[in-house]
A protein has these predicted regions:
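Acidic, surface-exposed loops and disordered segments
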Residues: 1-130
């Protein structure tokens, strides 16, 4: 499901805050890291590899977005925040996932504020099997 309506985004953030009263309110309000569009990806609970399929879908969304100049980020925390309490159940119902499906991943989309150079990588962390 794609959510780009700011009012709906705020409703979801408010539900996260209500479901986690001990969480810093700013953290709850920032759970989507400022992304103006969120894609909520659901998995088929009856298929044990469906989470991998969701990951591949998220990757394709992110690569496609980047090809059009749109930044993206894969977020797991909102999944936990939305599924570990009863206060968020109305939000999940509003997303309207089919019977037998559950929220698996969130992908935030938007135009990046910055484009830093890639950090140096340590090639020694890669192990080649001969």
């Amino acid at each position: 499901r794609v959510v780009d309506n700011p009012a709906v985004m705020n409703e979801i953030k408010d539900a996260v805050a209500a479901g986690h009263p001990n969480m810093d309110p700013e953290m709850a309000k920032g759970c989507f890291r400022g992304a103006p569009v969120m894609v909520f990806i659901a998995r088929d609970k009856s298929y044990d590899f469906s989470a991998y399929d969701c990951g591949l879908m998220a990757q394709n969304i992110m690569l496609s977005a980047w090809s059009m100049g749109v930044g993206s980020m894969c977020l797991g925390s909102p999944v936990r925040f939305l599924t570990d309490n009863d206060a968020c159940k109305p939000v999940l119902e509003r997303l309207g996932f089919s019977e037998g499906y559950e929220l698996c991943l969130c992908v935030g989309l938007g135009y990046a504020d910055e484009a830093p150079d890639a950090k140096p990588r340590d090639i020694n962390k890669v192990k080649f099997v001969e």
